[in-house]
Amino acid sequence: MKKVNSLSGGKSSSYIAANYPADYNIFALVRTNDKSCEYPDKKIRQIVSDKIGMEFIATLEQDNIIKVMLDLEQFIGKEITWLSPKTFDEVINSNGTGKNGKQYLPNMMTRYCTTEMKIKPIFEWWQKEINEIVEMRIGFRSTEMKRAKTVMDKLNSKGIDEMKAVIGKSKNGNRNRWGMVEWRVPTFPLIPDNINNTDVFNYWQKN
């Protein structure tokens, strides 16, 4: 089973990239077209544009995440695949309302954007590049058992995460046929290895 490190730009997932070698390291970037948020370094904007294959104007995450991920790639000596097929603006403009045109509540929107801008791009990349069940490492620390349990509770009876996706065409070929696709087994290596926030902090202080 191939191993994928899912990177958020934070210290914990970066620790995983540095200490748990994988077949792939993946980072999904949340972009915006809002020029009032424009990333200040033109050279870095171009580097990121080249990595994602489209124009990068700004991120809605902390600006320092960009440099963290670029530096991490040099630190581990292995390519990090950047994903960002849609901007936040595009996602909200096309899907920002619920039934009857009502706006999503903030907690609903947060979950929705996590799926649309983090999980879904990684799934679509997986479909194109791998398309077989992978082990996906997530950077929850030893003190974050509750977060890990939330993820594990959503797995199917075989312990595999599923995503709703197009699996073919209808009999007449006019419509897409949807189904649940098994794609990843989430693992949390920092939990069994008892790595906590202090351990992660100290590691990056030394490195």
For each feature predicted by the language model, list its residue ranges.
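Nucleotide-activated chemistry modules centered on ATP-dependent adenylation/adenylyltransferase
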Residues: M1-N207
